């Protein structure tokens, strides 16, 4: 082989080597690109908001009808932010027994920190044993009366889910606002009223108001109810019934004052400023239905002002109260 041929051969070999190296470089670059893209995709997937364990409970504010022994509802599904409680089975609850801070666990789910977007309760026409009705009142005579209407309740309240915490969402199914009676029949109030009748709170951000009245007889009634309002939101018109037959409809929550010891408890009040009002009721015509008698004048034995006091999270406001009679009499 002469020098020219040898040179040409070497040149060809170098060209082939460079071509192969170029191809290898392109292949390695492609592999690295795909790998980086997959990593980026995984990072994007993993950067979604971290979820927090959240327990969901249900409770009730008392119904103020003397002829009602108990109220049952059947919950078939619970959704928060579109997520259903996993493993939830249709449950029939004696909702009227869940007063004075008593709750029943509906289940648990994982939620991202921040404000909830929607909370939905699904009610069933049949009970947990697939017998009807699923939602009903038991009267003092033992009769079971079906509660008409309502299969889905979209709760208007939003709840803040706190990051890195064991959150407890409490749904306050206020029967006093949720039910209406027409003769011997019972039904849920209208959809819009019902949505505003159920509160949703995170118990981590709530407090309690408790109290003792030393002279309930001064209220001159069969039953006295304590109503908690956001400060400045009580008006005289609250004593009149709305279109659904509900009075004190804008109260945040309420509690009957015990006729035997004068005690009352209002639980799951979100931190903030409140005012407290007392109303007297009597069954004037012995029909089992309480009629509003009047507002009760009340004083406290402490420096706490009933027209404006603060409830803080994880705390209790205790009130020692004396009644001085019905207002306006």
Task: Place the predicted regions along the sequence by residue.
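A short, solvent-exposed, low-complexity linear motif enriched for acidic/polar residues
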Residues: 37-260, 267-271, 275-329
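Bacterial N-terminal signal peptides that target proteins for export
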Residues: 3-25
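Hydrophobic helical h-region of N-terminal Sec-dependent signal peptides
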Residues: 26-30
């Amino acid at each position: 082989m002469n020098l020219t041929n040898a040179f040409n051969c070497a040149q060809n070999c170098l060209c082939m080597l460079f071509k192969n190296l170029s191809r290898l470089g392109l292949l390695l670059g492609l592999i690295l690109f795909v790998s980086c893209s997959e990593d980026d995709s995984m990072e994007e997937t993993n950067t979604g908001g971290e979820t927090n364990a959240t327990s969901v409970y249900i409770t009730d504010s008392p119904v103020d009808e003397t002829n009602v022994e108990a109220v049952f509802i059947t919950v078939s599904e619970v959704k928060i932010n579109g997520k259903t409680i996993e493993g939830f089975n249709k449950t029939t609850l004696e909702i009227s027994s869940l007063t004075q801070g008593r709750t029943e666990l509906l289940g648990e789910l994982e939620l991202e920190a921040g404000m909830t977007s929607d909370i939905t309760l699904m009610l069933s026409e049949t009970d947990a044993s697939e017998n009807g009705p699923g939602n009903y009142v038991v009267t003092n005579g033992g009769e079971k009366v079906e509660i008409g209407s309502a299969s889905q309740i979209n709760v208007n309240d939003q709840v803040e889910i706190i990051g890195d915490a064991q959150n407890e969402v409490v749904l306050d199914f206020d029967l006093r606002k949720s039910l209406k009676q027409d003769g011997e029949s019972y039904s849920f109030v209208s959809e819009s009223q019902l949505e505003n009748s159920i509160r949703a709170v995170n118990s981590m951000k709530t407090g309690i108001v408790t109290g003792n009245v030393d002279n309930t007889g001064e209220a001159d009634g069969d039953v006295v109810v304590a109503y908690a309002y956001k400060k400045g939101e009580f008006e005289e018109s609250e004593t009149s019934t709305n279109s659904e037959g509900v009075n004190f409809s804008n109260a945040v929550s309420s509690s009957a004052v015990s006729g035997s010891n004068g005690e009352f408890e209002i639980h799951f009040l979100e931190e903030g400023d409140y005012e407290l009002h007392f109303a007297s009721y009597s069954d004037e015509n012995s029909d089992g239905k309480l009629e509003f008698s009047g507002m009760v004048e009340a004083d406290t034995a402490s420096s706490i002002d009933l027209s404006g006091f603060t409830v803080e999270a994880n705390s209790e406001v205790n009130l020692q109260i004396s009644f001085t009679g019905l207002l306006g009499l």
